[in-house]
A protein has these predicted regions:
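Conserved MFS/SLC helix-loop-helix module at the cytosolic interface between two early adjacent transmembrane helices
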Residues: 54-90
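Structural signature of the two symmetry-related core transmembrane helices
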Residues: 70-84, 265-280
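Symmetry-related core transmembrane helices of the 12-TM Major Facilitator Superfamily/SLC fold
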Residues: 161-178, 356-372
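Juxtamembrane intracellular "pre-TM" segments in multi-pass secondary transporters
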Residues: 1-2, 181-208
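Cytoplasmic helix-loop-helix junction between adjacent transmembrane helices
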Residues: 98-137
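Helix-to-loop junctions at the C-terminal end of transmembrane segments
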Residues: 55-67, 252-264, 347
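Transmembrane alpha-helices of Major Facilitator/SLC transporters
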Residues: 50-54, 239-259
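Helix-loop boundary and gating motifs at the non-cytosolic
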Residues: 2-49, 203-210, 214-231, 235-238
């Protein structure tokens, strides 16, 4: 394995570990300790992901002009600071602001890693390398909740102390990201303006799919843990459920190769699994039912990323790669920001479980759109790459 790829994987593992330790608890902390309503949880989720709607576009431009490893280091440093500040927050506005910093930091994490992998690996191996990168990140997300559960149950740490431990964990990734600066030098200095951003408009079906998946995932990360807590799932069991979710995601990534060969069917299965998982959530009141939902959604929230990424990369010119990655990630930001706001408003107006039924219905509609546009979802070679 090439050293820069290994360093990217290690960085992803560490960052995922930190995220897994504290992210599932943030909505519970906000609701139980700070006293946030579901609408306020939606606002916190919105501010968390709102920067990801715009900053990846800026980062995409920087990827073609500056050292990708240093950009990654800057993002992880900001992330470290934002998690620590979360541990001393006292109000909903403070949490919202600190989560916005986290969103900004994440915009400097994912795109540089994708770009380094894209530069080092040839197109034939890129899907597997991106999937492995995601696998290490998911592995961290899977192990993190177990560590969080152990700390909460056996060492009797508070939520705030758990956030501080997460800060120490992610700080280690600053070292590995700095080592990547040796390999993160850009090989091109083209002028990236709206040309690369406009490339995303060539993929309307992919954009619709990404927005649905990311909207559901944004709700999953920011509202769903509080919903489980309201249905009598304890904090430690919430962490355990996210561990189970991680197992499902890792198992899915092991089959990226076969799934890639059936792109259309895999993407249809992705949407249907998210929709079905949300329907199970709607009817869930026990740990066992939530476990079933986590296992189903683990597939859907995993496989769409490497497949859609490869579709747009193979159908676009290499000169647009940096800006295109930024535009691709910004599309996630739109969904991540809209999801919590949508779920928060709907939960306050129609009931806490209504958003999940809504996602099921929307998922069926998106599936029909994909079926009607099958040819646009096939991975094909672009000779200009």
């Amino acid at each position: 394995m090439k050293l820069p790829i290994l360093l990217v994987y290690l960085t992803a593992l560490i960052v995922g570990l930190s995220y897994g330790m504290h992210n599932p608890i943030v909505p519970v902390f906000s609701k139980e300790i700070i006293g946030a309503s579901y609408f306020e949880l939606g606002i916190i989720g919105l501010t968390n992901f709102l920067p990801y709607m715009f900053i990846p576009l800026f980062v995409g431009i920087l990827l073609d002009k500056f050292n990708n490893g240093l950009l990654l280091s800057a993002g992880i440093t900001l992330n470290t600071a934002s998690i620590y500040l979360l541990s001393i927050s006292q109000s909903v506005p403070e949490i919202a602001f600190f989560r916005a910093l986290t969103g900004m930091a994440h915009a400097f994490f994912w795109p540089p890693c994708e770009r380094i992998i894209s530069q080092v690996e040839d197109p034939e191996n890129r899907v597997k390398s991106i999937a492995r990168f995601m696998g290490f990140f998911v592995g961290g997300l899977m192990i993190g909740p177990l560590i969080g559960t152990f700390l909460l149950e056996n060492l009797d740490v508070t939520y705030r102390i758990l956030f501080q431990y997460s800060t120490y964990a992610i700080a280690i990734a600053i070292i590995t990201s700095l080592l990547l600066s040796k390999y993160g030098k850009t090989t091109q200095h083209s002028t990236i303006a709206f040309g690369s951003i406009k490339q995303m408009t060539k993929f309307p079906v992919i954009v619709i799919m990404l927005i649905f998946c990311s909207t559901a995932f944004g709700t999953f990360l920011t509202i769903y843990p509080a919903f489980m807590n309201d249905r009598s799932i304890s904090e430690s069991n919430i962490e355990l459920l996210f561990f189970i979710f991680g197992i499902s995601r890792l198992a899915t990534l092991a089959f990226v190769g076969p799934l890639q060969r059936r792109t259309f069917h895999s993407l249809i299965a992705t949407i249907l699994s998210i929709a079905a998982g949300m329907l199970v959530v709607f009817y869930s009141f026990t740990f066992e039912m939530f476990t079933i939902a986590m296992l189903i959604m683990g597939f859907g929230f995993t496989i769409y990323f490497p497949l859609t990424f490869e579709i747009i990369m193979r159908k676009s010119q290499k000169k647009f790669s940096g800006g295109l990655i930024g535009a691709y990630e910004a599309t996630f930001g739109i969904g991540w920001a809209a999801g919590p706001l949508f779920a928060g408003i709907v939960a306050e107006a129609f009931g806490k479980d209504t958003p999940y039924l809504g996602f099921f219905v929307i998922g069926i509609i998106v599936t029909l759109i994909l079926v009607l546009n099958r040819k646009k979802l096939q991975i094909q070679w672009n000779q200009n790459l």
